[in-house]
């Protein structure tokens, strides 16, 4: 769902099989990579060419450049999601930062992203003026976000029987 607009420019296919990743085998990561076409070269004739992806390749961007991304998204540039959870950490204040040190809690970024994806509301509260081309999100700073709600229940089916809900998608 997210990959239609957002890139993962700092994530290689091999990362899918590393510890801390989603738990794919090396063979699964290689098979996933091979489904993508990657520009390579030049060959002996000096021409660039496309080849199947390899585990060492990075995920290709959904757009050829920033201008194309902005044109497809109403002037907004979708952020790269490679490091989004590290970039969206937030201070928890006293005494929670002490608790976080003791418990090794480091999930502020993932919690922010999950909240953002679940924070869309069809109608803003009374008195709130939503700029044209924006969507109301109760967790986004300022509450006006250019990204439309990307998730809806039943959109993705899980092989393991996990619930097909916005809450589950946002967590994943």
Language-model-detected regions and their locations in the chain:
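The canonical Cys-X-X-Cys-His
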Residues: 2-9
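Iron-sulfur (Fe-S) cluster-binding segments and ferredoxin-like electron-carrier domains
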Residues: 9-15
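Extracytoplasmic electron-transfer domains, predominantly the class I c-type cytochrome c fold
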Residues: 15-161, 166-171
């Amino acid at each position: 769902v997210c990959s239609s607009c957002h890139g993962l420019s700092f994530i290689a296919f091999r990362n899918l099989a590393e510890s801390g990743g989603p738990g794919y085998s090396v063979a699964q990561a290689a098979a996933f990579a091979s489904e993508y076409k990657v520009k390579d070269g030049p060959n002996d004739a000096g021409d660039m060419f496309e080849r199947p992806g390899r585990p060492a390749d990075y995920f290709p961007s959904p757009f050829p450049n920033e201008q194309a991304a902005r044109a497809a998204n109403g002037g907004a540039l979708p952020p790269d999601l490679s490091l989004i959870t590290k970039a969206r950490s937030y201070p928890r204040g006293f005494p929670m930062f002490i608790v976080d040190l003791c418990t090794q809690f480091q999930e502020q970024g993932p919690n922010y992203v999950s909240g953002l994806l679940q924070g869309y509301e069809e109608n803003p509260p009374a008195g709130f003026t939503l700029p044209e081309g924006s969507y109301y999100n109760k967790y986004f700073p300022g509450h006006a976000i250019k990204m439309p709600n990307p998730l809806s229940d039943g959109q993705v089916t899980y092989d393991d029987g996990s619930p097909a809900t916005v809450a589950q998608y946002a967590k994943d």
